[in-house]
Each structure stands twice: as C-alpha cells, then as structure tokens.
A protein has these predicted regions:
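Conserved glycine-rich cofactor-binding loop
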Residues: 12-13
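The beta1-alpha1 cofactor-binding region of Rossmann-like NAD(H)/NADP(H)-dependent oxidoreductases
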Residues: 53-63, 95
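A glycine-rich helix->loop->beta "capping" turn
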Residues: 67-78, 86
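Substrate-binding pocket helix/loop in short-chain dehydrogenase/reductase
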Residues: 89-90, 97-99
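Active-site helix of classical SDR
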Residues: 113, 149-152
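Residue(s) in the substrate-gating loop at a strand-loop-helix junction
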Residues: 133
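C-terminal beta-strand-loop-alpha-helix "lid" module of Rossmann-like NAD(P)-dependent dehydrogenases
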Residues: 166-215
Length: 274
C-alpha cells in the first residue's frame, strides 16, 4: 500500500485518536489535529505529527493545511472527524449554541474541504472522508440541531462527491451508529442543562438519563469499529459513497425509513418514559 499523507481532525480522543493510530500503523504519514494538543502528545511516539487546529477558526485551519503542504508537498486524504452533539428542544437551545453546533459540525468541515481541494485538484488525486452519522439519516427526540448538522454533512458530501470526481478526487462518508465514546454523555448533559426550568424539562431529563445509561453500558460498538470503516474508505481503490458501521446503524436507518412518521415519533417519546 502506497503511503498517503493524511490529515485527521478531532484526533485528541475517541474515534479520531483510534483512527490516527490505525492509519499510522498501516504505514501512512498522519497529521493529527485538534484544539487540545496536550492530549495528543502520546501519538508522537507512533510517528504521528500533532497539529493545533480549531475548526471554528478559519486562520487556524488555513495555517494547519499550509504547514502540511510546506512539509510534504501534498495532502492525499482529509478525514473530517471533529464534531460533537448538542441536544435540546428546538425552542430552548440558544441561537448561539445552535450556531456553534453548525460551526463545528458543518462549516468547519466545509472550510477544510475548501482548503485542501486546490492541492488535491493540482495533484489530480485525493480523498475526503467525512464522518457523518446515522443521525444524518434519522431524527431522535430532542436532537434537532445535531440532526440539522448531520443532515447537512450528508448533503454537502453528496454534492462534493459529484463536483470533485472529474478531478480524480473521491468523497466518502462514514455513518456510525451507537459508538462507545464520551459523545453520548456530553449530549445528555447538554440536553439536561438546556431543558432545566422549561416546559420540556420532564421528558428531556428522562431522555437524558436514557442516553447516559446507553452510553455507559457495554452494549455499544467500540471506536475501532468506525476505524475499520475509515481504513476501508482511505485505502480502497474505489471507495463507496457511504460506509454504515456500528451497533444498530442499519436497524435505525431501516426503521426510520419503514415506520410511518407518527409511529417513529411515538417510539422516540417512549424513550423518555423509560
């Protein structure tokens, strides 16, 4: 396998960290990017370069891409992994928090694509792997703004795949299901805090408890499950448009497609009664 120069964001923990290690183990030159560079220092022992990058800061992203191009002369793969989930009722999530959700999950991802595309186009080759979610194919109770962000990633990736193909650039999406990371705990805390003292507090508190219990259990897939899909998307000669992976990913998408909307809505509300 030819060595690729890879930039991966959100690499300080969870899926990003696991994927950075696996890509390096496969012989690729990996640039791991995140805000907390201190958490990524152990990656250096595996031959991974560490970059400070804030995906809400355009200059930070531009500086990071420029540093890689200066050192390597090319970027073969961008893995857009940075993201988080802010849960809460549409009415109670502040516009500031909603904008931040989109800044991190959508606009940061889009800006990094814009920054690497000129170099990839000049190379006549390249690959962009966007970490989406089954949350871009279904909607959960109180997940409104997070789902807006992931549905946007799906649409942007589909559009970019068509636009970039004539230049030899492939675009793939990873759609994880329930993965055992801190994501669910953080989302549950956001939900509880955003609903405090509002008309939604009772259901939101119960749903937050359901989320927390789910993500503290041992029934979820590990980050390595997603990493395997990322490796396939990076190394395949002809990558698929979508790689669905992780526990319940196929089941969630199937039932969201199959069930009438009122049945799905009732199923989601039932989760707040458990």
């Amino acid at each position: 396998m030819e060595q690729k120069i890879i930039l991966i964001t959100g690499a300080s923990s969870g899926i990003g960290r696991d994927a950075a290690l696996a890509l390096a183990a496969h012989g690729h030159k990996v640039y791991a990017a995140a805000r907390r560079t201190d958490l990524m220092e152990p990656l250096r022992a595996h031959g991974i370069e560490v970059l400070h990058m804030d995906v809400t800061d355009g200059q930070s992203m531009a500086d990071g891409v420029e540093a890689i191009l200066k050192a390597e002369g090319r970027i073969d793969v961008l893995v857009n992994n940075a993201g988080y989930g802010y849960f809460g009722a549409v009415e109670t999530v502040s516009m500031e928090e909603a904008r931040r959700q989109l800044e991190v999950n959508v606009f940061g991802l889009a800006r990094l694509c814009q920054l690497v595309l000129p170099a990839m186009r000049q190379q006549r080759s390249g690959r962009i792997v966007n970490i989406s979610s089954v949350a871009g194919r279904s909607v959960f109770y109180f997940g409104g703004w997070y789902h807006v962000s992931k549905y946007s990633v799906e649409a942007l990736s589909d559009a970019l795949r068509m636009e970039a193909k004539p230049f030899g650039i492939d675009v793939a999406m990873i759609e994880p299901g329930a993965i055992k990371t801190d994501w669910g705990i953080i989302a549950a805390d956001h939900l509880r805090d955003s609903a405090a003292g509002t008309a939604y507090e009772t259901d939101a508190t119960r749903w937050a408890a359901t989320l927390r219990s789910m993500y503290q259990s041992n029934h979820l897939s590990s980050p390595s499950t997603v990493t395997r899909a990322i490796l396939r998307a990076v190394e395949s000669r002809r990558p698929r448009a979508r790689y669905r992976t992780g526990r319940l990913s196929g089941t969630i998408v199937f039932f969201h497609w199959l069930l009438p909307a009122r049945w799905w809505d009732a199923l989601m509300r039932l989760g707040a009664r458990v």
